[in-house]
């Protein structure tokens, strides 16, 4: 129970054949489940039958994201949707957002570095900080932004210095990608052909998703 698993074997009536089984026991309390169990439920497309939007699970962060160092910082990921835009983004997904400060109640967490402060005219702090790009440009759009490549992370095999690096290994092992469509050219022109797809593991919400 409570998101644990067990293994065993089952003998058929004839007694001549056996099958190995791994049983996953799913808790209706999201935080009581291992990430591997949550993935199994997601794979089966059954997330909404066990949990609800807003349910939370503890995520302890360790390591460095850009210029921000984190040491045993416990936050709470929360569900924001099940199979959102499945025909476009990918099926059998449970969509989470980072993060809240508590398992219930609490406040939203905003990750920032030592360059955060009042906006007195934009001056680039350079690469590796929590800015969309290292200079005042949107060339290349979301796809080429330093926020996507250097802060959020795009790879499960090369992720040093990104958010992917600081989440628990158990969570990293079950991350699923989604397909996002954004303007990946930039320059301010409202041109439909500029909208192309990217494969993302930890995307930012779009303006319309926030609203």
Please describe what each predicted stretch is.
Residues 1-2, 14, 61, 70:
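Structural motif
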Residues 2-24:
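Structured interaction patches on ligand/partner-binding surfaces of diverse proteins
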Residues 26-211:
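Collagenous Gly-X-Y triple-helix signature in extracellular proteins
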């Amino acid at each position: 129970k409570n998101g644990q698993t067990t293994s065993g074997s089952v003998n058929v009536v004839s007694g001549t054949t056996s099958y190995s089984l791994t049983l996953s026991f799913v808790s209706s309390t999201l935080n009581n489940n291992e990430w591997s169990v949550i993935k199994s439920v997601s794979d089966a497309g059954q997330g909404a039958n066990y949990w609800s939007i807003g349910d939370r699970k503890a995520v302890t962060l360790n390591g460095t994201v850009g210029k921000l160092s984190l040491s045993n910082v416990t936050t709470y990921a929360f569900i924001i949707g099940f199979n959102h835009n499945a025909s476009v983004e990918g099926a059998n997904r449970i969509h989470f957002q980072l993060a809240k400060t508590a398992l219930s109640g609490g406040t939203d967490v905003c990750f920032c570095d030592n360059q955060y402060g009042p906006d007195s005219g934009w001056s680039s702090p350079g690469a590796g900080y929590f800015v969309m790009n290292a200079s005042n440009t949107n060339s290349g759009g979301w796809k080429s932004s330093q926020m996507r490549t250097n802060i959020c992370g795009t790879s499960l095999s090369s992720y040093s210095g990104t958010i992917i690096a600081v989440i628990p290994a158990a969570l990293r092992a079950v991350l699923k990608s989604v397909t996002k469509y954004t303007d990946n050219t930039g320059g301010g022109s409202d041109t439909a052909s500029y909208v192309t797809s990217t494969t993302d593991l930890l995307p930012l919400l779009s303006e319309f998703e926030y609203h």
